[in-house]
From Swiss-Prot, chain B:
The gene is Ddc. Pyridoxal 5'-phosphate binds at residues 183-184, 227, 305, 334. Transmembrane segments: none annotated. InterPro entries: Aromatic_deC (IPR010977), PyrdxlP-dep_de-COase (IPR002129), PyrdxlP-dep_Trfase (IPR015424), PyrdxlP-dep_Trfase_major (IPR015421), PyrdxlP-dep_Trfase_small (IPR015422), Pyridoxal-P_BS (IPR021115). Pfam families: Pyridoxal_deC. The active site is at residue 227. Homodimer. It comes from the Eukaryota. Residues 1-17 have a biased composition (Polar residues). This is Aromatic-L-amino-acid decarboxylase.
Length: 637, 510
């Protein structure tokens, strides 16, 4: 493909993109394909000879699009928004065209410097304290773009781990590092994103998952009590991850309380994960939700969620960039350059060494919309969520399960978890709407998120109409099945007990050390299993770990050591279900039913007759289609 | 017997009918569009397409290395985001005024630093489509095409390299491939999988040892020539990593085994070894056919890092360098370096992904059976949760070039390296510091390291070509990497003239 053809095909792709986004509402939100669908549509090997571009574009429509879940669809209400906008697409296109890799300043100065400046722009707009901004006088902080929030949490936990180990080694110079590592404890709420747990597993440290309050908010007193208890047991608190805007219910941990309590535990790194909600703080009326940020050591938010910026664009700010980079620095000669001391080299700020020119799209978006345009966009989504909340509240059969502060509404039918799971399943299977569940306060709830960039009030009303239609049919059926109801209640009790047991499990320090005895005093032990003799150093408080193959020795790799205990495995899976989707292809359901491994999912069978009914329904015209028809009629005049 | 469909006219107890929406749309503010409308996008896009085409078409004419100093950009743009939207024309104008002065032009034929970072029109256009679809493929259902195209593309790619069937999803076994962002991430993921596997093994043998005791004993290995990301993976993974001394820049099986046996004698637990095919310093190749069997013998996880050179294995004449690949547990190379696929696209295959899935994921497998590979949840195979639709650009590139043209691209670069090497050897002032492999020439002036440092500084200072140095066993040399897809034979002559002219200048100053 030469540049002449690129100009032609590039514009054809632009046309395709415009057409795709303009007619998106005419597609099913979710595809009706089954796993493995694509394998049979594509040849098993790459073509030896070049293929024609037009054939490739036909394949995009015929083979790729049937398998696309349309995240930009006005009826997509799952997860959180996946940012997408024309300026962002073009910024990424320019980044591709320039094609530099910005691991050091010299590798492409504009790549590094635009990132530094744009992160300061965004930090100011959000209202971060000056010490997080790189170019403020006297600041030791700064911002960086990561691939995702998972990496923001991971790199800050790695930095905190490095810092804590360094401090412990200074205090206990003869103790082996593995043993020091076993003392470290991180903390987060039960509502925190699963990436915190994943980061703890990668860092190979213990994570204590704490119970939030009735509003799903982690409180300062809870943190304090947990840390004090752990310190008494000889453990070393080193990291706390708090969430502003949890995935399950968009709840807010109480950052002012937590920050104050952490003043009693110097050396603990406080991270704030505001992946979705952080974007909204560009609106003055929402800045109170950021209260307490001055206590934080790091903060992350994802413009690729709610700021019309395409994935990948997750922004992280730290108070002290040296503490971050010193944990990650590996510095070979071929990456050094003449200005190494004067410039920020972003390869030291993340897991990958190489990095794309991502700041271009953020720069394009911030300029093309302006802060006021982005504020308007966020406020619009919040209004839509409030509108949906009002619709739910008006229907006495439903209830709201979260405080609707931003764009997420958690709701459910009053009644059993099974009833709500059925409702969500039949809605999603219809392909008219796409939502996902979450577990909040031990109840199965349905998450409805205002997602689409150009969503309208009519879209919200239409979504509610769909939900009500399906609920009406489901409730009608349920009224005729009292026996099923009795069985549902029994299953619900079983599931509730399992869930409750698991929640207690993960918050109970006995998981980490079954020998913990709250009533007793900590035992002092002069003996260490390490061959290094600690003669002359202060004794380390260490409790004996009982050898019990049924107990969890530590959080990292716990599943490996308990892989034979399927009941626990099943319980564990419930904990993280909120990240999964409820859409089950038909063959998967049948295969799952025949699966050899028991799981709670198999107990919750799906009713095939409902699916048959759904297939008979004619697709309902969306308001946008009506408007398009009107527009066509107007054009005829 | 089918259930009678419910009718909307059936009355319910609800006072507001069937509960449908009855809030007036007027309650919301009138819809104000803040979006760039499609016609404006088309104009902006056309200008951008033209800009990119002209930029790449005329890239020779730009100075490859910028003349700016740190901090150049700050005075050129405001220190805060604009409150009001700006015109796209203003953003477009700032590309030349603000961005281009600070761009190091990686795709200039005069850029010879690092290794290639691929760039091609099909990949650029595919990334545009990926950006428009804008799905996040962390589970199969989150966008089935995203996952499934990746499965098939990894099989296509694996077959192009003739990887053993155990690595391919289509074999129906455990194995399969995944696109990571970078080789650094592939190396770390492999290390974490290896760690999980070894911990479980040791735990079964020594139930009385706690996992942190075991962790303290784990040790991994790599050549002293391995990429810095390998050392970093050890740092991040919290394990010791031993550097094994290479012989002619290549790690031999005997040296690896000696290191392993020494560590075992000291009570340590070897668990992981990285074999590099195509080192960054000199594009040297570890003896995989020796190191692999040694690793298997001692039950280590063998990870093969072929980040740059892996692309060359689509050419049969270079596959002998992969000999021993069947002994590996994981393999990685970067199509975004040399296969005309834009960054980020790092291909990784695993013989048994379950160790990676179990190593650091919090959502364990529901069923204990071998994964069929049709619909993996790729979020378990990587560090981030979210992922872009990267398979599209691989698909576009492989189809629009076809394997034969990609092979031709590889061969052309290898010939250019040989051409430059011949020019060096013909000049008695210069010597080769290492064997010429693939598209990399390692050369230096005969004499001291200081002379060569001065030479490099002078070459780069002229701004006409861009090289970086490397050092092996205290010998400093210059690396000439063939990077750009626009490079012609005349460009190699030009680059040689630049090197020679800089050397001439130095001689005249003495």
């Amino acid at each position: 493909m030469d540049s002449t053809e690129f100009r032609k095909r590039g514009m054809e792709m632009v046309e395709y993109i415009c057409n795709y986004l303009e007619t998106l509402n005419e597609r099913r939100v979710t595809p009706s394909v089954e796993p493995g669908y694509l394998r049979h549509l594509l040849p098993p090997e790459a073509p030896q000879e070049p293929e024609d571009w037009d054939q490739i574009m036909r394949d995009v429509e015929d083979k790729i699009m049937p398998g696309v879940t349309h995240w930009q669809h006005p009826r997509f209400h799952a997860y959180f928004p996946a940012g997408n906008s024309f300026p962002s697409i073009l910024g990424d296109m320019l980044g591709d065209g320039i094609g530099c890799i910005g691991f050091s300043w010299a590798a492409s100065p504009a790549c590094t410097e635009l990132e530094t400046i744009v992160l300061d722009w965004l930090g100011k707009a959000i209202g971060l304290p000056d010490h997080f901004l790189a170019l403020k006088e006297g600041s030791t902080g700064g911002g960086v773009i990561q691939t995702s929030a998972s990496e923001c949490v991971l790199v800050t936990m790695l930095a905190a781990r490095a810092q804590a180990l360094k401090r412990l080694k200074a205090q206990h110079p003869f103790v082996e590092e593995g043993h020091l590592l076993s003392k470290l404890m991180a903390y987060c709420s039960k509502e925190a994103h699963s990436c915190v747990e994943k980061a703890a597993m990668i860092c190979f440290v213990k994570l204590r998952i704490l119970e939030p309050d009735d509003d799903a908010s982690l409180r300062g007193q809870t943190i304090y009590e947990a840390m004090e208890e752990d310190e008494l047991q000889g453990l070393v608190p080193f990291f706390v991850s708090t969430t502003l805007g949890t995935t399950g219910s968009c709840a807010f941990d109480n950052l002012p309380e937590i920050g104050k309590q952490l003043q009693r535990f110097p050396g603990v790194w406080l991270h704030v994960d505001a992946a979705y909600a952080g974007n909204s703080f560009i609106c003055p009326e929402l800045k109170p939700l950021l209260k307490g940020i001055e206590y934080a050591d790091s903060f992350n938010t994802n413009p690729n969620k709610w700021l019309l910026t395409n994935f990948d664009c997750s922004t992280l700010w730290v108070r002290d960039r040296i503490r971050l980079t010193s944990a990650l620095v590996v510095d070979p000669l071929y990456l050094k350059h003449g200005y190494s001391d004067a410039a920020i080299d972003y390869r030291h700020w993340g897991v990958p060494l190489s990095r794309r020119f991502r700041s271009l799209k953020l720069w394009f978006v911030l300029r093309s919309y302006g802060i006021s345009g982005l504020q308007h966009y966020i406020r619009h989504h919040i209004k839509l969520a409030k509108r949906f909340e009002e619709l739910v509240l008006k229907d006495k059969r439903f209830e709201i399960c979260n405080q609707v502060k931003l764009g997420l509404v958690c709701f459910r039918l009053k009644g059993s978890d099974k009833l709500n799971e059925k409702l969500l399943s039949i809605i999603n299977e219809s392909g008219k709407l796409h939502m996902v569940p979450a577990s909040v306060g031990d109840r199965y709830i349905i998450r409805f998120c205002a997602v689409a960039q150009n969503a309208t009030a009519e879209d919200i009303d239409y979504a509610w109409d769909i939900i009500v239609d399906f609920a009406n049919e489901l409730l009608e059926k349920e009224q005729h099945d009292e026996l099923s109801e009795i069985m549902n209640r029994k299953k619900q009790d079983t599931l509730a007990q399992k869930r409750s047991f698991f929640v207690r499990m993960v918050s109970d320090p006995k998981i980490y050390n079954p020998a913990i005895n709250k009533a007793g005093t900590p035992k002092l032990s002069m003996e260490l299993p390490s061959p290094v003799v600690s003669r002359g150093s202060a004794p380390i408080i260490r409790t004996q770990s009982s050898v019990d193959h049924n107990s969890w020795i530590s959080w990292p790799l716990a599943f490996l050591f308990n892989s034979n205990n399927e009941e626990k495995g099943s319980n564990v899976s419930l904990r993280f279900r909120h990240l999964d989707t409820n859409v089950r292809p038909s063959s998967s359901r049948r295969n799952s039913g025949a699966g050899s491994s028991p799981s709670p999912e198999n107990e919750l069978d799906y009713v095939n007759v409902q699916q048959q009914q759904m297939e008979q329904r004619s697709p309902r015209r969306s308001p946008m289609a009506v408007r398009k028809a009107s527009s066509t009629r107007d054009n005829l005049n | 017997m089918s259930h009678i469909p419910i009718s909307n006219t059936i009355p319910t107890k609800q006072t507001d009918g069937n509960g449908k929406a009855n809030i007036s749309p007027d309650k919301l503010d009138p819809k104000v569009s803040i979006d760039m409308e499609a016609p404006e996008f088309k104009d902006f896009a056309k200008t951008m397409v033209d800009f990119i085409a002209e930029y790449l078409e005329n890239i020779r004419e730009r100075r490859v290395l910028p003349e700016v100093k740190p901090g150049y950009l700050k005075p050129l743009i405001p220190d805060a985001a604009p409150e009001k939207p700006e015109k796209w024309q203003d953003v477009m104008q700032d590309i030349e005024r603000v961005i281009m002065p600070g761009v190091t032009h990686w795709h200039s034929p005069k850029f010879h630093a690092y290794f290639p970072t691929a760039n091609s029109y099909p990949a650029i256009v595919a990334d545009m489509l990926s950006g428009a679809i804008a799905c996040i493929g962390f589970t199969w259902i989150a966008s089935p095409a995203c996952t499934e195209l990746e499965v098939v593309m990894m099989d296509w790619l694996g077959k192009m390299l003739e990887l053993p069937a155990e690595f391919l999803a289509c074999s129906g076994g455990k194995g399969g491939g995944v696109i990571q962002g970078t080789a650094s991430e592939s190396t770390l993921v492999a290390l974490l999988g290896a760690k999980a596997k070894k911990l479980k093994e040791v735990k079964e043998l020594h139930p009385e040892w706690d996992e942190h005791t075991i962790l303290g004993k784990l040790v991994g290995y790599c050549s002293d020539q391995a990429h810095s990301s390998v050392e970093r993976a050890g740092l991040l993974g919290g394990v010791k990593l031993r550097s094994v001394q290479s012989e002619n820049h290549r790690m031999r099986g005997a040296a690896l085994e000696k290191a392993i046996e020494q560590d075992v004698a000291e009570g340590l637990i070897p668990f992981y070894a990285v074999v590099t095919l195509g080192t960054t310093n000199s594009c040297a190749f570890d003896y995989l056919d020796e190191c692999g069997p040694v690793g298997n013998k001692h039950n280590l996880w063998i990870h093969v890092d072929a980040a740059y050179a892996g692309s060359a294995f689509i050419c049969p004449e270079y596959r002998h360098l992969m000999k021993g690949i069947e002994s590996a547990d994981s393999f990685n190379f970067n199509p975004h370096k040399w296969m005309l696929v834009n960054f980020d696209c790092s291909a990784m295959w695993l013989k048994d992904p379950s160790w990676v899935v179990n190593a650091f994921n919090v959502d364990p497998l529901y069923l204990k059976h071998d994964m069929q590979g049709s619909a993996p949840d790729y979020r378990h195979w990587q560090i981030p949760l979210g992922r872009r639709f990267r398979a599209l650009k691989l698909w576009f590139v492989l189809r629009l070039y076809g394997v034969e043209n990609l092979q031709a691209h590889i061969r052309r670069h290898c010939n250019f390296a040989k051409q430059f090497g011949d020019l060096c050897v013909a000049d008695s002032r210069f010597e080769l510091a290492a064997e010429i492999n693939m598209g990399l020439v390692c050369f230096r002036l005969k004499g001291s390291n200081e002379r060569n440092e001065a030479l490099l500084k002078r070459i780069n200072g002229r701004g006409h070509i861009h090289l970086v140095p490397a050092k092996i066993k205290d010998v400093y040399f210059l690396r000439m990497a063939i990077c750009s897809r626009f490079t012609q034979s005349e460009d190699m002559e030009y680059s040689w003239k630049e090197v020679s002219a800089a050397a001439d200048e130095m001689e005249q100053e003495q």
